Amino acid sequence: MEAPGLAQAAAAESDSRKVAEETPDGAPALCPSPEALSPEPPVYSLQDFDTLATVGTGTFGRVHLVKEKTAKHFFALKVMSIPDVIRLKQEQHVHNEKSVLKEVSHPFLIRLFWTWHDERFLYMLMEYVPGGELFSYLRNRGRFSSTTGLFYSAEIICAIEYLHSKEIVYRDLKPENILLDRDGHIKLTDFGFAKKLVDRTWTLCGTPEYLAPEVIQSKGHGRAVDWWALGILIFEMLSGFPPFFDDNPFGIYQKILAGKIDFPRHLDFHVKDLIKKLLVVDRTRRLGNMKNGANDVKHHRWFRSVDWEAVPQRKLKPPIVPKIAGDGDTSNFETYPENDWDTAAPVPQKDLEIFKNF
């Protein structure tokens, strides 16, 4: 399929959970971050690419695997339907995603190379991460061993710590938004709900099972929500299911606010202690959100075997190495039908004004 077909793609704005939270005193010491400032990004056009496959779908679009025609490099192209973005009032989230990704550079965060829009779609050209979603590996295995969960938790902590150092709250931590690269290291993706913190934010957004109590109660929220979500994620990785679940969101919210956690018997004492301290309803007492910030999490006994200098340098041995046949391999992603997703009507010029700098 030729690149003009790109201009018709619609992007995977992941069905995610969105969360925010509040800020602790004192700047945490960061995981040493091999952050290399990217050179000025190249300028592309849609005609530079061939569309090869759809690797994700979402509320108002798709993510495509594309191949640059000349250099033969592979990228992920996120294509969002402007009419759907406007209808769902997601304009600010789209701008947030672009601004956050332009600001960050970290081994465990997805890279953004180029953005564009026409009269129907918004486009974000990002690195292609061929290992697929952590969610798929968790679903296939049922649950992870303690050492496997420890590895992913350590890399995620370094990513969260880096974002918080830049006053950015991620608000969408979940297995579906964690990709594995060809070596098995993580890449956080989908920054549609990430937000630069000026003060507390009040938006209710996110997947019910991962929402922090302060989000549900509309008390304003900031960094602490990411540490809450980490507690949920660790529980889910090691158990195979989240700690708070119900048939409907209201039931989930009630259980979150009650804060009662039923641990599977196989979890060891230290990880249960860590999860309890991350899932403290009072955010002022939540691990990661107190005076020492992320250091309190990294120094917890469950992480006693982790070399925190080595983590962001990608020196820890990944427990899962994806099976990848080549750079453009899509076998680790779901297969999506190439249906009539590209039927969005052109948007009037006045409605495009909000996207003029995209």
From Swiss-Prot:
Region Disordered, annotated ranges: 1-34
Activity modulation: Binding of cAMP to the PRKAR1A or PRKAR1B regulatory subunits induces dissociation of the holoenzyme heterotetramer. The released monomeric PRKX is then active and able to phosphorylate its substrates.
Amino-acid positions noted as binding ATP in the UniProt annotation, renumbered to this chain: 55-63, 78
GO BP annotations, alphabetical order: angiogenesis; cell adhesion; cell-substrate adhesion; endothelial cell migration; endothelial cell proliferation; epithelial tube morphogenesis; kidney morphogenesis; myeloid cell differentiation
Record-annotated AGC-kinase C-terminal domain positions: 304-358
Active site, renumbered: 172 (proton acceptor)
GO MF entry, a single one: cAMP-dependent protein kinase activity
Keyword ATP-binding in annotation: yes
Modified residues (N-acetylmethionine): 1
Entry superkingdom: Eukaryota
Record bears the keyword Zinc-finger: no
Ranges for domain Protein kinase: 49-303
Keywords recorded for this protein, A-Z: Acetylation, Angiogenesis, ATP-binding, cAMP, Chromosomal rearrangement, Cytoplasm, Developmental protein, Differentiation, Kinase, Nucleotide-binding, Nucleus, Phosphoprotein, Serine/threonine-protein kinase, Transferase
Catalytic activity: L-seryl-[protein] + ATP = O-phospho-L-seryl-[protein] + ADP + H(+); L-threonyl-[protein] + ATP = O-phospho-L-threonyl-[protein] + ADP + H(+)
Tissue specificity: Widely expressed (at protein level). Specifically expressed in blood by macrophages and granulocytes according to PubMed:9860982.
Main location: cytoplasm
PTM summary: Phosphorylated; autophosphorylates in vitro.
InterPro entries to which the protein is assigned, alphabetical: AGC-kinase_C (IPR000961), Kinase-like_dom_sf (IPR011009), Prot_kinase_dom (IPR000719), Protein_kinase_ATP_BS (IPR017441), Ser/Thr_kinase_AS (IPR008271)
CDD domains the UniProt entry points to: STKc_PRKX_like (cd05612)
GO CC terms: cAMP-dependent protein kinase complex; cytoplasm; cytosol; nucleoplasm; nucleus
Family label: Belongs to the protein kinase superfamily. AGC Ser/Thr protein kinase family. cAMP subfamily.
General function of this protein: Serine/threonine protein kinase regulated by and mediating cAMP signaling in cells. Acts through phosphorylation of downstream targets that may include CREB, SMAD6 and PKD1 and has multiple functions in cellular differentiation and epithelial morphogenesis. Regulates myeloid cell differentiation through SMAD6 phosphorylation. Involved in nephrogenesis by stimulating renal epithelial cell migration and tubulogenesis. Also involved in angiogenesis through stimulation of endothelial cell proliferation, migration and vascular-like structure formation.
Complex formation: Like other cAMP-dependent protein kinases, the inactive holoenzyme is probably composed of 2 PRKX catalytic subunits and a dimer of regulatory subunits. Interacts (cAMP-dependent) specifically with the regulatory subunits PRKAR1A and PRKAR1B. Compared to other cAMP-dependent serine/threonine protein kinases, does not interact with the 2 other PKA regulatory subunits PRKAR2A and PRKAR2B. Interacts with cAMP-dependent protein kinase inhibitor/PKI proteins; inhibits PRKX. Interacts with GPKOW. Interacts with SMAD6.
Disease (UniProt): A chromosomal aberration involving PRKX is a cause of sex reversal disorder. Translocation t(X;Y)(p22;p11) with PRKY. Chromosomal translocations proximal to PRKY account for about 30% of the cases of sex reversal disorder in XX males and XY females.
Name of the molecule in the record: cAMP-dependent protein kinase catalytic subunit PRKX
The organism of origin for this protein: Homo sapiens (Human)
Organism taxonomic ancestry: Eukaryota, Metazoa, Chordata, Craniata, Vertebrata
